[in-house]
Structures are given as C-alpha cells and as structure tokens.
C-alpha cells in the first residue's frame, strides 16, 4: 500500500493526520483509538502492515485498555494478530474488565486465535475482575483442550 492510499484510508476513517504522516501515526480519534487499532478492528492486514512498517506503536491502549491485538482478535483476523505479535504487541494486557486477548478469544470460541496466542506465550492463568480464567470461559471444546494443554505444560 502506498502512502497516498494509506492517507486516503485514514482520512475516510476519520483520522485527520498532518504531515509528515510518520509523526502522526499514533494520533487518536474517539475512545483513544489509534489508526493501528482501527485497522486491526476492521481486520485490514494491508493497512495494518503499512502502519507497522511506518512505525505505528503496537503497544498503545485505548480508553478501555484494549490494544490493537485485542481488536485484531475481535475482527477474527489471524493475519493481523500474527503481525501485531511479531511487531511486539503485548498479549497479556488486561482491559478495564481484567480480560486479556486470550480470555476474549476463548470466551468467543476463536480457536485459531487461542492457539496463536498460546504459541506466542500468552499467560492462560490471568483472571478477569470476576476471577475467571480463559479456561473457565472457553466457549468450545477445542479452546478448552488447548487451554488445558497449556495449563498442564505450565505445571510440568
């Protein structure tokens, strides 16, 4: 994706970025949403990778303490999630409810993303504010199996 197309996409999404673009990649709109978070939420790997290549920060959190990785998981985009993990996005960040991306993915039955997060080293023992782990919230048998295996490996 070239810079002109990226600027057009950003403008269409409500980001009014000044020149040079690289100095404003982490500017925010409503709810402290960055362009990277928005691209992740849309599951747009092309835009997400272009933003990362220009230096967008994958560690930033919005007003709810969700980061771009959370939004990639919400969008069910394994490609975006993998790119963000590779770029250094934190995967154990807990949002205002104490949920991590892994807890969200397990509770939503997003098995490929649960597998990706566990392989990246996500902590399956973290709990929500209500004291639930990803395993306890697993929405399907496949997620439950992956989480039980991770739990067993943690105690081995």
Enumerate the predicted regions with their spans:
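Ankyrin-repeat-protein effector appendages
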Residues: 1-15, 120, 129-156
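Intrinsically disordered, low-complexity regulatory segments in ankyrin-centric signaling systems
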Residues: 1-42, 49, 53, 154-156
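Ankyrin repeat A-helix N-terminal signature
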Residues: 9-12, 38-44, 71-77, 104-110, ...
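Ankyrin repeat structural motif
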Residues: 13-19, 44-52, 77-85, 110-118, ...
